[in-house]
Protein backbone atom coordinates (compact mmCIF):
# COMPACT_ATOMS: atom_id res chain seq x y z
CA UNK A 1 0.00 0.00 0.00
CA UNK A 2 2.91 2.34 0.76
CA UNK A 3 4.32 2.23 -2.77
CA UNK A 4 0.87 2.51 -4.35
CA UNK A 5 0.14 5.68 -2.37
CA UNK A 6 3.58 7.09 -3.20
CA UNK A 7 3.05 6.60 -6.95
CA UNK A 8 -0.53 7.87 -6.74
CA UNK A 9 0.77 11.12 -5.29
CA UNK A 10 3.64 11.44 -7.79
CA UNK A 11 1.31 10.84 -10.75
CA UNK A 12 -1.56 12.97 -9.48
CA UNK A 13 -0.93 15.84 -11.89
CA UNK A 14 1.65 14.45 -14.31
CA UNK A 15 1.79 11.54 -16.73
CA UNK A 16 4.20 9.02 -15.23
CA UNK A 17 5.96 6.16 -16.99
CA UNK A 18 7.33 3.49 -14.67
CA UNK A 19 10.10 1.24 -16.01
CA UNK A 20 10.42 -2.01 -14.08
CA UNK A 21 13.37 -4.39 -14.17
CA UNK A 22 12.49 -8.10 -14.20
CA UNK A 23 15.35 -10.09 -12.65
CA UNK A 24 15.25 -9.60 -8.89
CA UNK A 25 12.22 -7.28 -9.02
CA UNK A 26 9.32 -9.38 -10.33
CA UNK A 27 11.18 -12.67 -10.92
CA UNK A 28 13.64 -14.39 -8.61
CA UNK A 29 17.29 -13.86 -9.45
CA UNK A 30 19.63 -16.62 -8.39
CA UNK A 31 23.29 -15.80 -8.95
CA UNK A 32 25.12 -18.60 -10.72
CA UNK A 33 21.98 -20.48 -11.79
CA UNK A 34 21.31 -21.31 -15.45
CA UNK A 35 19.54 -18.74 -17.58
CA UNK A 36 16.28 -20.71 -17.68
CA UNK A 37 14.07 -17.66 -17.44
CA UNK A 38 10.77 -19.31 -18.20
CA UNK A 39 11.11 -21.29 -14.96
CA UNK A 40 12.04 -18.35 -12.72
CA UNK A 41 9.93 -18.02 -9.60
CA UNK A 42 7.54 -15.06 -9.77
CA UNK A 43 7.73 -12.57 -6.90
CA UNK A 44 3.97 -12.39 -6.40
CA UNK A 45 3.91 -9.60 -3.81
CA UNK A 46 5.81 -7.24 -6.12
CA UNK A 47 3.72 -8.30 -9.12
CA UNK A 48 0.51 -7.63 -7.17
CA UNK A 49 1.72 -4.19 -6.07
CA UNK A 50 2.63 -3.25 -9.65
CA UNK A 51 -0.61 -4.61 -11.10
CA UNK A 52 -2.58 -2.23 -8.88
CA UNK A 53 -0.71 0.72 -10.41
CA UNK A 54 -2.29 0.00 -13.82
CA UNK A 55 -5.55 1.44 -12.55
CA UNK A 56 -4.04 4.76 -11.52
CA UNK A 57 -4.72 7.80 -13.64
CA UNK A 58 -1.61 9.08 -15.46
CA UNK A 59 0.43 5.88 -14.84
CA UNK A 60 1.89 3.69 -17.57
CA UNK A 61 3.90 0.55 -16.77
CA UNK A 62 6.84 -0.62 -18.89
CA UNK A 63 9.46 -3.35 -18.62
CA UNK A 64 13.15 -2.48 -19.00
CA UNK A 65 15.17 -5.68 -18.78
CA UNK A 66 18.50 -7.01 -20.01
CA UNK A 67 19.35 -10.57 -21.06
CA UNK A 68 22.51 -12.23 -22.33
CA UNK A 69 21.17 -14.00 -25.40
CA UNK A 70 18.61 -13.18 -28.08
CA UNK A 71 16.50 -16.29 -27.40
CA UNK A 72 15.95 -15.09 -23.83
CA UNK A 73 13.86 -12.20 -25.14
CA UNK A 74 11.17 -14.72 -26.11
CA UNK A 75 11.53 -16.50 -22.75
CA UNK A 76 11.08 -13.26 -20.84
CA UNK A 77 8.06 -12.29 -22.92
CA UNK A 78 6.48 -15.72 -22.35
CA UNK A 79 7.15 -15.36 -18.61
CA UNK A 80 5.50 -11.92 -18.59
CA UNK A 81 2.51 -13.26 -20.54
CA UNK A 82 2.09 -15.96 -17.88
CA UNK A 83 2.77 -14.06 -14.64
CA UNK A 84 2.41 -10.34 -15.37
CA UNK A 85 0.29 -9.88 -18.51
CA UNK A 86 -0.65 -6.34 -17.44
CA UNK A 87 2.73 -5.31 -18.91
CA UNK A 88 1.52 -4.75 -22.46
CA UNK A 89 3.64 -6.29 -25.22
CA UNK A 90 4.39 -2.92 -26.83
CA UNK A 91 5.65 -1.58 -23.50
CA UNK A 92 8.38 -4.18 -23.00
CA UNK A 93 11.99 -3.24 -23.72
CA UNK A 94 14.06 -6.41 -23.37
CA UNK A 95 17.59 -5.77 -24.60
CA UNK A 96 19.97 -8.60 -25.49
CA UNK A 97 23.68 -8.27 -24.81
CA UNK A 98 24.27 -10.65 -27.72
CA UNK A 99 23.38 -7.78 -30.08
CA UNK A 100 24.56 -5.01 -27.74
CA UNK A 101 27.80 -6.07 -26.02
CA UNK A 102 27.78 -3.55 -23.16
CA UNK A 103 27.18 -3.64 -19.42
CA UNK A 104 23.61 -3.70 -18.14
CA UNK A 105 24.06 -0.27 -16.58
CA UNK A 106 25.21 1.22 -19.90
CA UNK A 107 22.39 -0.43 -21.84
CA UNK A 108 19.76 0.88 -19.43
CA UNK A 109 21.35 4.33 -19.32
CA UNK A 110 21.46 4.50 -23.13
CA UNK A 111 17.83 3.37 -23.38
CA UNK A 112 16.60 5.93 -20.87
CA UNK A 113 18.70 8.69 -22.45
CA UNK A 114 17.11 7.92 -25.81
CA UNK A 115 13.61 8.63 -24.53
CA UNK A 116 12.26 11.82 -25.97
CA UNK A 117 9.51 12.59 -23.51
CA UNK A 118 8.30 15.25 -21.15
CA UNK A 119 6.61 12.64 -18.96
CA UNK A 120 7.84 11.88 -15.49
CA UNK A 121 10.03 8.75 -15.60
CA UNK A 122 10.47 6.30 -12.73
CA UNK A 123 12.86 3.33 -12.71
CA UNK A 124 12.48 0.40 -10.32
CA UNK A 125 15.57 -1.82 -10.19
CA UNK A 126 17.38 -4.09 -7.74
CA UNK A 127 20.91 -3.36 -8.99
CA UNK A 128 22.67 -0.59 -7.06
CA UNK A 129 25.22 -0.05 -9.85
CA UNK A 130 22.44 0.60 -12.33
CA UNK A 131 20.63 2.92 -9.93
CA UNK A 132 23.83 4.89 -9.21
CA UNK A 133 24.67 5.17 -12.92
CA UNK A 134 21.21 6.51 -13.71
CA UNK A 135 21.32 8.85 -10.70
CA UNK A 136 24.66 10.29 -11.80
CA UNK A 137 23.64 10.79 -15.44
CA UNK A 138 19.90 11.39 -15.52
CA UNK A 139 18.98 13.59 -12.58
CA UNK A 140 15.36 13.97 -13.66
CA UNK A 141 14.55 10.24 -13.38
CA UNK A 142 13.00 9.11 -10.11
CA UNK A 143 14.65 5.94 -8.79
CA UNK A 144 13.35 3.24 -6.50
CA UNK A 145 15.11 0.19 -5.16
CA UNK A 146 12.99 -2.95 -5.51
CA UNK A 147 12.60 -3.15 -1.72
CA UNK A 148 10.31 -0.12 -1.90
CA UNK A 149 7.62 -2.40 -3.36
CA UNK A 150 7.42 -4.40 -0.13
CA UNK A 151 4.90 -3.33 2.50
Task: Explain the meaning of each model-derived region.
Residues 14-17, 57-60, 118-121, 139:
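Short coil/turn segments at beta-strand junctions that form active-site/ligand-binding loops
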Residues 25-26:
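Hydrophobic "anchor" residues
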Residues 29-33, 73-76, 132-136:
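A short acidic (Asp/Glu
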Residues 33-63, 70-74:
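Short, acidic loop-to-helix structural element flanking the phosphoryl-transfer center
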Residues 63-65, 123:
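Structural beta-sheet core signal
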Residues 67-119:
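Substrate-recognition "cap/lid" segment bordering the active-site pocket of phosphatases
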Residues 112, 117-151:
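Acidic, Mg2+-coordinating phosphoryl-transfer loop and its flanking beta/alpha structural elements
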